[in-house]
């Protein structure tokens, strides 16, 4: 193996929408999302892989949605969601502040749970391996000081 991989924390994936979206703050069945536009990262990204895995686990596919938009950055997803262009699935820790500020809302899905490990990865035996280990220690120390964030 050419890489070192260390788990930092576990994060929940949630469904997000604009606060003005008809499903904002509601609890729905997965299929109730289908009439809406789905916004997601481009094929080949980890986010895309996670989304396809989530949808597959619930007998869904991107083609079950009324339409979909594939974009290149998470910031573009956030902006489109805030503008009520559609809904998306993202790591909760990435949008927590926007949820707290009320510029985004969560759609709760019956019997839906999706957690992923967030890892720190670097090339083994690289010139920067020792600095990466030091940075990893700093990250772990910082995250442990925050306690259980329910990320």
Residue ranges and their predicted role:
Residues 2-43, 130:
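Flexible hinge/capping segments at coil-to-helix
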Residues 4-7, 29-31, 59, 96, ...:
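Short secondary-structure boundary/capping segments
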Residues 4-14, 101-114:
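Short beta-strand->loop
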Residues 37-60, 129, 136, 146-147:
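Secondary-structure junction motif
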Residues 45-46, 75-76, 94, 115, ...:
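Short alpha-helical
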Residues 60-107:
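Hydrophobic hinge/microswitch elements
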Residues 105-148:
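A late-sequence structural motif
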